[in-house]
A protein has these predicted regions:
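Glycine-rich, anion-gripping cofactor-binding loops and their flanking helix/strand elements
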Residues: 8-93
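Phosphate/pyrophosphate-binding active-site segments
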Residues: 1-2, 86-131
Length: 131
């Protein structure tokens, strides 16, 4: 139901490149942690890259209406010491149940392998365009 989802990638999603590209091609805004850099090419039109502590990137993030965090810890150096406002609702995918809402409160946490879950999500977006 999101009109403009944000996908935040971390090192736990390193094997998810194909699914992430499918989602980005459909208009999902993608940003990555330092550890998730390269999952989606920085040159992709939907990529906000890994260096996101700037007013212009934060303005783009503020236009999103849903955050899916895939395999990222949302570290302090990537979120202005956890003051960066991430769109809600927020859903986290992590294989480690202890990661649930570790640094940001999540509305839901899916304990799963990012590669499998993002691939399943990408398979469901056929024909869908966001943004």
């Amino acid at each position: 139901q999101a009109k403009q989802p944000l996908l935040w990638l971390g090192g736990g999603a390193l094997e998810s490149g194909e699914a992430v590209k499918t989602l980005a091609d459909a208009g999902v805004t993608v940003i990555s942690s330092t550890h998730g850099r390269g999952i989606l090419a920085d040159s992709h039109r939907a990529s906000l890259r890994a260096f996101h502590n700037s007013p212009s990137v934060e303005a783009l993030i503020s236009q999103c209406d849903f955050t899916l965090v895939a395999g990222s810890r949302l570290r302090s150096n990537e979120t202005r010491s956890w003051t960066l406002e991430l769109p809600t609702p927020r859903v986290q995918i992590d294989i480690d149940p202890a990661a649930a809402s570790r640094n940001y409160l999540m509305d839901n946490t899916l304990v799963a392998d990012c590669r499998a879950l993002l691939a399943a999500l990408a398979a469901r977006v056929q024909g869908r365009i966001w943004g």
